UniProtKB/Swiss-Prot annotation:
One GO CC annotation: cytosol
Sections of the chain in a coiled coil: none
Protein name stated in the entry: Methionyl-tRNA formyltransferase
Naturally occurring in which organism (per UniProt): Rhodopseudomonas palustris (strain HaA2)
Recorded GO MF terms: methionyl-tRNA formyltransferase activity
Reactions this protein catalyses: L-methionyl-tRNA(fMet) + (6R)-10-formyltetrahydrofolate = N-formyl-L-methionyl-tRNA(fMet) + (6S)-5,6,7,8-tetrahydrofolate + H(+)
Length: 312
């Protein structure tokens, strides 16, 4: 028999899971999401991607600023949920909320726990050069991503993969995993295992100060840095354009042959020297402009061989 669920999520990453649980036939009593925020040129209040999808599905949406009041707890309990599914909600759940559903609260986390607990597991996995990532369903407790694990799926991280690529792949994989987990919970057969005490690491929130590219690092490290911050906040450097240093974000690149001083342009195809080897820029973005391929950029803004790219 389908479960009665409360779904809690906010960004695009959570939308596939909401859709998959709804398509499975679970009774989603309510969707909790973060409050609307100003966005766009007019800075009008906009609901989160999850809230918009829930409204389209006809599911009641709640956007409380806190869950730590008696009123918020009473409202949450009023849904009489069998379980809560939490995917990138963006708010820490107090113990009283965790205890409210009959069968508990279950979180979809975008890493292979206990590695990369915390806010930015996808970015940190790519930036650290991890060979793989994945998604895990865990039964939540009051710790930071410390709950017992129910199910997991893995995915390889390639040199060509940006955070956007990994995000989209894990969102799809995670939706299927959560459907399987809730089906097992429905049957009474969901098995839990404690997380290992070894290999614990924390994925700190990305700081914009990290975005500056240091071409004095090895090419592989520069590539991982760029792909781990693409598209947001976007790893940047300054290109000499019309006599000025113009900041551009490099969104996608590849390892390339060549040697030179770090930051030196090795050709007319946006190949830039690093401490060892080089990277070739594949996609970039100027401030206020749309992302474009390197070929599109160079048609309007040729960059000569031998010039130096700065990241001051």
């Amino acid at each position: 028999m389908p479960l009665r669920l409360v779904f809690m999520g906010t960004p695009d990453f959570a939308v596939p899971t909401l859709l998959a649980l709804s398509a499975y036939g679970h009774d989603i009593a309510a969707v909790y999401s973060r409050e609307p925020k100003p966005a766009g040129r007019g800075m009008k209040l906009q609901h989160s991607p999850v809230a918009q999808e829930a409204q389209r599905l006809g599911i009641p949406v709640l956007t409380p600023k806190t869950l730590r009041t008696d009123e918020a707890l009473a409202e949450f309990r009023s849904h009489e949920a069998d379980a809560a599914v939490v995917v990138a909600y963006g708010m820490i759940l107090p113990q009283a909320i965790l205890d409210a559903p009959k069968l508990g609260c279950y979180n979809l986390h975008g890493s292979l726990l206990p590695r990369w607990r915390g806010a930015a597991p996808l970015n940190r996995a790519i930036m650290a050069g991890d060979a793989e990532s994945g998604v895990m369903v865990m039964k939540m407790d009051v710790g930071l991503d410390t709950g017992d694990v129910a199910m997991a799926e893995r995915i390889a991280i390639t040199d060509a993969m940006t955070v956007t690529d990994l995000h989209d792949a894990l969102a799809r994989l995670g939706a299927d995993l959560m459907v399987r987990a809730m089906a097992a919970l429905e049957r009474g057969g969901l098995q839990l295992a404690r997380q290992s005490e070894h290999g614990v690491s924390y994925a700190a929130k990305i700081d914009k100060a990290e975005a500056k590219i240091d071409f004095a690092r090895p090419a592989q490290a520069v590539l991982r840095h760029i792909h781990g911050l693409s598209p947001f906040p976007g790893a940047w450097c300054e290109l000499p354009i019309d006599g000025e240093a113009v900041r551009v974000k490099i969104l996608r690149c590849a390892l390339a042959d060549g040697r030179g001083a770090p930051g030196e342009m090795l050709g007319d195809d946006l190949t830039i020297a690093c401490a060892d080897g080089a990277i070739r820029v594949l996609q970039l973005q100027r401030a206020g402009k749309q992302p474009m391929s390197a070929d599109e950029f160079l048609r309007g803004t040729p960059i000569a061989k031998g010039v130096r790219v700065s990241s001051s």
